[in-house]
C-alpha cells in the first residue's frame, strides 16, 4: 500500500498534533500510511524527556509540551516538518530501524544538494560540517563505553545540526517525525539548548550555501521518505 503524501503548508502545531493522534487512534489495518509535509509558526516544543533548564530565554516565543520523544527544539517558518504516520507492524520494522530510515532519507536528500549529512552516535538527527558541507571525511569514532560507566557524550566539534528528529509510536503506529532547516531565522535556537545539548550549533541549508524554496525542499524530502519508509 503506497503512502499518501499531503503538503499542508503552514499549519497550527497543536491542531496538527491532534489530527495525527486522532488518525492514529482510529486507523485500522486497511487504512493507508500518510506523510504530512508542513511548517509551523514560531514555537518551542518540549519532548517527553524535556527539562526546563534547557529552555534558557524563550521570550515571546511560546513553549508547548509535546508527547514526542526527545528534548526541546524550535519550529518556525522556513523549516520543512515531515510527519510520517506509519503502521510499523505492517511495514515490517521496529522503532530503531524506523529512526534509521528517516535519517537515511534526510542524508540522501542532502546528497542531492551536494551536502554530506552525518549521524552522531547517541544524538538522533542529522548533522553537517558548516565549514565543509560537501566533504566526505568520516567523523571520528565514538570511544567505546567502559563497563559500569556512562556512555561518552556525543562529540559535536565542527558540526551543526540541520535536521531534528522526534517520534511517537502508539498501537504500533508512528506520528510526529523530522524537521529539516531550509531557510530560517536561526536566532531562536540560541535561546535554548537544542535537543538538550548546551552550545550545539544549529544551521540551515541557506547557511551552508544551498538556496531552495520551501516547496522544493519539501518535495524532495517527501520523495526520499516515501522511498526509505517503504516496507
UniProtKB/Swiss-Prot annotation:
SUPFAM superfamilies named in the record: Class II aaRS and biotin synthetases
Main location per the UniProt record: cytoplasm
Domain BPL/LPL catalytic: 29-231
UniProt GO BP: protein modification process
Gene Ontology molecular function: lipoyl(octanoyl) transferase activity
Source domain of life: Bacteria
Location relative to the cell: Cytoplasm
Pathway: Protein modification; protein lipoylation via endogenous pathway; protein N(6)-(lipoyl)lysine from octanoyl-[acyl-carrier-protein]: step 1/2
UniProt keyword terms in alphabetical order: Acyltransferase, Cytoplasm, Transferase
Gene3D superfamilies: Bira Bifunctional Protein, Domain 2
Positions of the catalytic residues: 195 (acyl-thioester intermediate)
Pfam families per record: LplA-B_cat
Site (Lowers pKa of active site Cys): 161
Family: Belongs to the LipB family.
Biological role: Catalyzes the transfer of endogenously produced octanoic acid from octanoyl-acyl-carrier-protein onto the lipoyl domains of lipoate-dependent enzymes. Lipoyl-ACP can also act as a substrate although octanoyl-ACP is likely to be the physiological substrate.
Protein name: Octanoyltransferase
Gene name in the database record: lipB
Amino acid at each position: 500500500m503506497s503512502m499518501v503524501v499531503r503538503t499542508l503548508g503552514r499549519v497550527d502545531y497543536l491542531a496538527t498534533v491532534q489530527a495525527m493522534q486522532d488518525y492514529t487512534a482510529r486507523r485500522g489495518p486497511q487504512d493507508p500510511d500518510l506523510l504530512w509535509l508542513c511548517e509551523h509558526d514560531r514555537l518551542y516544543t518540549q519532548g517527553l524527556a524535556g527539562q526546563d533548564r534547557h529552555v534558557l530565554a524563550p521570550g515571546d516565543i511560546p513553549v508547548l509540551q509535546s508527547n514526542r520523544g526527545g528534548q526541546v527544539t524550535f519550529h518556525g517558518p522556513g523549516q520543512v516538518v515531515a510527519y510520517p504516520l506509519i503502521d510499523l507492524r505492517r511495514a515490517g520494522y521496529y522503532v530503531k530501524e524506523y529512526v534509521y530510515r528517516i535519517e537515511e532519507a534526510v542524508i540522501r536528500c542532502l546528497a542531492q544538494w551536494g551536502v554530506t549529512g552525518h549521524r552522531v552516535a547517541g544524538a538522533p538527527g542529522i548533522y553537517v560540517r558548516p565549514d565543509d558541507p560537501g566533504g566526505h571525511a568520516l567523523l571520528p569514532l565514538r570511544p567505546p563505553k567502559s563497563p559500569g560507566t556512562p556512555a561518552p557524550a556525543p562529540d559535536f566539534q565542527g558540526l551543526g545540526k540541520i535536521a531534528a528528529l522526534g517520534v511517537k509510536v502508539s498501537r504500533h503506529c508512528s506520528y510526529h517525525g523530522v524537521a529539516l532547516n531550509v531557510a530560517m531565522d536561526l536566532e531562536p535556537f540560541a535561546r535554548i539548548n537544542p535537543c538538550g545539548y548546551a552550545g550545539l550549533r544549529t544551521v540551515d541549508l541557506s547557511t551552508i550555501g544551498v538556496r531552495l524554496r520551501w516547496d522544493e525542499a519539501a518535495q524532495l524530502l517527501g520523495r526520499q521518505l516515501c522511498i526509505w519508509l517503504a516496507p
